[in-house]
Amino acid sequence: KDCVPSDDIQNNIKANLPKIDKWISERCRINNEVIFVVSAGPSLDVKRIKEDKEELEEGGKVVKIVCVKHALPILMENKLIPWACTLLDPRPIEGVSTHGVVRSTLFDSVNPRTHFLVASMTDPSVVDLLKEKKASIIGWHAFSEAVKGGIEGTGEDALMITGGTNAGLRTIGIGHTLGFREFHLYGFDMSLGEEPSEEIQKSVDEEGKPKFLNVSVGDGSYWTTGELLAGGQDLEKLFKTANEMDLILQFKGTGMGAKLWEIEKPQEMKGYSSWGM
């Protein structure tokens, strides 16, 4: 289910089509580079990302860092400039995010080397701000309920990218479209770092439902939110279907995401040399 009405999403798309010059419009050939997908969960460890990147690069691998918007300021503060940042949120830039941050402040520090992978459903105010900052913008179309019937104004059938309810998981869909097959996931906890206070546990959302949930996964118990729980379900599905999609995955972190990885970790596929060839 989309987080804003379908009409809002359609209006955002119409406004963004003329604003963005470059679009991911076709699938690319497979490459052997690695994407570090960086989400903003409590276990996000920039030092570890730097060390892992260095180690792979010493072994001759090409590593590209793609982050979600909440991880962008953390990476920039630590002088780790991401290759790309994925944006999916259709809500206005002045609003307060689910992390309790005014969205516009996430883009205070933007490097021209970072490509912003902007979903066409993103609020146009985000595109305007990025243009003001002379950022590199590349558009893409996110498949959602609102665009099941196609996208007006794109001429032929637009390439729509699937892959999850949040920008972190949708990054894997984008990467797959661009020809990447190896993804290392950081900060995908899908749960809170600690138990909320009793007062906070009583909080409810606009629909009167509890904001915070305590869920059990395997032998673990985790505090999470509805949004993070949906992400956890997407993560579980990703782990189960990774081999069918020819994905090589690594998971670095803690929380509910780490427990799901422990339970559903894809079996490592054999190389042809296992038959003595």
Predicted regions and their residues:
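Metal-ion/cofactor- or nucleotide/acyl-coenzyme-handling active-site neighborhoods
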Residues: 1-277
